[in-house]
Amino acid sequence: MKRTAWRVLSLALCLAMTALIAVAQNTTAAKAAPKKPAAQKAKPMADAQPQQWSSITVVRVKPDMVTEWQDLQKKVVNPALKKAGVKERSVFETAVFGESYEYVVITPITSFAQYDEPMSPLRKTLGEDAFRDYQAKSRRCIVSSHTFGDLARLDLSYMGKMMTMTGPPKLAVVNSLSIVPGRAAAFENLVKSDVLPVMKKADVIGYFISQTMFGGDGYGYTSVVFYDSFAEIGKGSPFLRVLGPAGAAAFFAKFAGVVAHQERTIARFNPDLSFSAAQ
């Protein structure tokens, strides 16, 4: 259970970094754009936020091969993907609390049609001989690798200070939740009516929810609260700080019969193994 939960938690953190920053950039661009004449008839979905999909690969690395695996990412994979036109690749890992030697790698999915291509961007760029060499070295380094398709739930998220940040927060408290079948709508309503107001009042860096659509728990949601230090985390839950002990107890009671299980961990962004279009 803990290994599965960590995978789901990591997925949410990865998605949060790309989705929230992307939306922040889009919002800033929209504010700077000149005003356009109002359309005669507005299209129903004209202002809808496009879905944010990401490909996430969870890799368990052999303890004695961590350095070799990291070198492959820095010297082979990242340069090749940049050359292939991939704009972003983010890597995350456990921050003290969780399993060691696990890494989560994320790249945005621009279109699902990309998976209809017979060759991956990495294979195309490296060529057959270099790609086979990379595969052989990678197999010697890893225990397992599992890829997911995740959907960001921006309608259940609060961007907070993410809009003005130039990079990802250092840490995140990530909570994996399994919802009671048939209670998903109740959970989402509670997030909108009760959770988001608390996060805004607590002035958190950002709060994010995602769903794993392919390869994960069909009833699973994952929430992330961002922090810049363990000292900030040590100040206590935003719900306790905003609502007080009695208010927090009443708040959590609302989730009885809605949340079947939850598990919490802390994760951090690894800048040395990541790249973005700005770099």
Question: Each predicted region: which residue ranges?
Answer:
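Bacterial N-terminal signal peptides
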Residues: 10-20
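N-terminal secretory signal peptides that target proteins for export/translocation
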Residues: 1-7
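N-terminal acidic, proline/glycine-rich, low-complexity intrinsically disordered segments
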Residues: 2, 20-29
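Short S/T/G/P-rich N-terminal loop/turn motif that feeds into the first structured element of a domain
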Residues: 25-279
